[in-house]
């Protein structure tokens, strides 16, 4: 009887060991972007996975349907209905004696704009995807010649190396020790250029192309492309979702403004890609925007927040930056069917994070 119990115990232990070895992780960094009549879905690779299954649920449908089985880490679905919302989820699988499935990654949503390339919400959804998992790297997103986008600046989805590098850093992280460590993270203009590339394109691009440029030139250049309007720092009256704000030393994206005049923004600034808040219109620190940024960083990025809890920025973010604002509507590059440009930062953050 003792021998039988011992054998059963060993079988159970061995069985658990085999299952542990066979267990697959869930895909991280899942991102979906509607680009005209196409949807590109990307994710970070899962260790030991042989492939991935992608499921879709279109607006008005009750259940998810499998739409693709692939060995790659990104796919493009073509000829999608315009002006429609789509949800996606991805899981990894491994084929041994039988097929083993991992858990689904985070469910994501995008929209194919009816008459535009993309939407303001798609832009902000893309911009917050690397938050909390991507460090600030001086030169990150640029080419070695420092003349334009490098591989990361024209990369569809998240580079898994960003998360790997981020996970090894401590609260004492000093970006000066990692200058031009290409592939490890993004600097301010590399981040903005990467965000725009991902709402405009569906395939990785060639270094030297894309939308990475000096921070000081971004707002004026995007206006010259015909995407929207430009205002110098002295002419700015308000801040709206999706605004790109340029100065001689930095560039950031507006998430939304608050009733006290403070602004929630997303940017790559030491230590990395994160949400931050400005003072209110009277210059008082610790206003609504900072409270919102802290609350969302603490809730959704706890590991990052424990290491880098600072979320406040100075008054210069409201006074010293030129502004680019997307023109929306029929025939524009970005449309705003979600009316983000008319919503407060609180409403936008709730929609981006809480309504999943």
Features from the language model and the residues they span:
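Recognizes extended acidic, P/S/T-rich segments that occur
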Residues: 53-83, 95-99
